[in-house]
Amino acid sequence: PDKAFSAIPIACSSSHSAQNIALNELARQAIMADPVWDNGKYVLKNVQPKNGLAVARMVGHISYLSEKGMQEKFGRKLQEKADYEFSFNADFQVESYLRHQGYAFVERFDANSVLYITRAMDYFDLSKQFKGGLVEAFKNQKTKFLIISFSSDWLYTTKDNKDIVIALNASGADVSYSEIITDKGHDSFLLDEPEFLKTLKGFIAVSYTHLTLPTMR
């Protein structure tokens, strides 16, 4: 922490909620239920549990969006058809979208990696190692913080982010906070969100105006 002049935690939390853990468990179970997973030994056969990994990605992708955003983008629109097929094909656009996102993911990610990364995220608890909780964790901080949340993010909520802000304030840290009003959910930080970009630029400009960088030798 002493080596960081400033930090911008974006759409995060100090630990996963029960809902976060539950969503990750759904993803893990989808992978492990795929017969190709073979207790993680699929790598020895040079194969990938594609179906399980695709479903895991679908679960994750839903959590990155918002209900309003999904409704406005997809609603109940059908996928290139005039009426229901009364089958298990993708009748709705949102079904087709999820399938595309799921199976595109398997080409660039590894199933075992998802298991371990989600497990590590679930175990992470910033306050656990400090008896005083988050306030103690942030004690004697010299880093300048900007915490940013998104109003429609239900994965890492505004409350999750405000809890960090409250703890930083209580510890005497230099912290500012901004909630970006948007219907794009958790994925907002990856998208063209003008207010988000303006907030970042403003913080960086003010933070580094009078900063003297060390001379390189």
What are these regions (language model features)?
Residues 209-215:
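Conserved small/polar residues in nucleotide/adenosyl-binding loops
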Residues 183-193:
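Catalytic histidine-centered segment of alpha/beta-hydrolase-like enzymes
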Residues 152-156:
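Acidic catalytic loop of the alpha/beta-hydrolase fold
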Residues 147-149:
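Short beta-strand/loop motif that positions the catalytic acidic residue
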Residues 9-104:
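Alpha/beta-hydrolase-fold enzymes
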Residues 168-182:
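Catalytic histidine neighborhood in serine/cysteine hydrolases
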Residues 140-145:
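Short, proline-enriched alpha-helix->beta-strand connector loops that line the catalytic pocket
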Residues 134, 157-167:
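Short alpha-helix in the alpha/beta-hydrolase fold that links the catalytic acid
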